Amino acid sequence: MKMELKVKPIENGTVIDHISGSKALKVYKILNIEEKLPITLALNVPSKKGVMKDILKIEGLELTKDDVNKIALISPDATINIIKEGKVIKKFKVDLPKRIDGIIKCTNPNCITNKENIEGKFSIEQKNTLKIRCEYCEKFINSIIISK
């Protein structure tokens, strides 16, 4: 007998869908979600396209522009659904901007941003295989450290 698990839809909040498989916990951590908010997390769920995806549902959360940029860095194919009174009022795919300020930390220990209290500034050089360049030291980074 085939068993199904039904998850109650959220009334007001955000659903982050099509998160790359096994990356929802990373998305959860970088969003610094309040512990009291009801959260539903689904890991490695088969999508209609036949690939594995994660889903994160957060009741009562409205994402900021920085939040969406952080999600795009971790899972560039994610989709955001804004829910009001049980209905999707807005749906969009995340998209990396050309430049990201303040949310990434440079991995170069000699970069001025690691020696002084300066916010990191990065150019997105390539989106499909993520390539990011620090605007201070010019170093290309491939391991992302979210700073806040």
From Swiss-Prot:
Free-text remark on how the cofactor is bound: Binds 1 zinc ion per subunit.
Cofactor(s), names only, from the UniProt record: Zn(2+)
Q: What PANTHER family has UniProt attached to this entry?
A: ASPARTATE CARBAMOYLTRANSFERASE REGULATORY CHAIN
Q: Write out the residues that bind Zn(2+).
A: C106, C111, C134, C137
- Role summary: Involved in allosteric regulation of aspartate carbamoyltransferase.
> What is the name listed in the Swiss-Prot or TrEMBL entry for this protein?
Aspartate carbamoyltransferase regulatory chain
For biological process, the GO terms are: 'de novo' pyrimidine nucleobase biosynthetic process; pyrimidine nucleotide biosynthetic process
Question: What family name appears in the similarity comment?
Answer: Belongs to the PyrI family.
Alphabetical list of Pfam families matching this protein = PyrI, PyrI_C
* Keyword Cytoplasm listed: no
**Transmembrane region(s):** none
Subunit organization: Contains catalytic and regulatory chains.
Species for this entry: Methanococcus maripaludis (strain C5 / ATCC BAA-1333)
Q: Recall the taxonomic lineage recorded for the source organism.
A: Archaea, Methanobacteriati, Methanobacteriota, Methanomada group, Methanococci
Residue ranges of coiled coil: none
Keyword set, alphabetical order: Metal-binding, Pyrimidine biosynthesis, Zinc
User: Is the keyword Plastid in the record?
Assistant: no
Q: Which InterPro entries match?
A: Asp_carbamoyltransf_reg_N, Asp_carbamoylTrfase_reg, Asp_carbamoyltrfase_reg_C, Asp_carbatrfase_reg_C_sf, Asp_carbatrfase_reg_N_sf
Identify a single GO molecular function assigned to this protein.
metal ion binding
Q: Name one GO cellular component term.
A: aspartate carbamoyltransferase complex
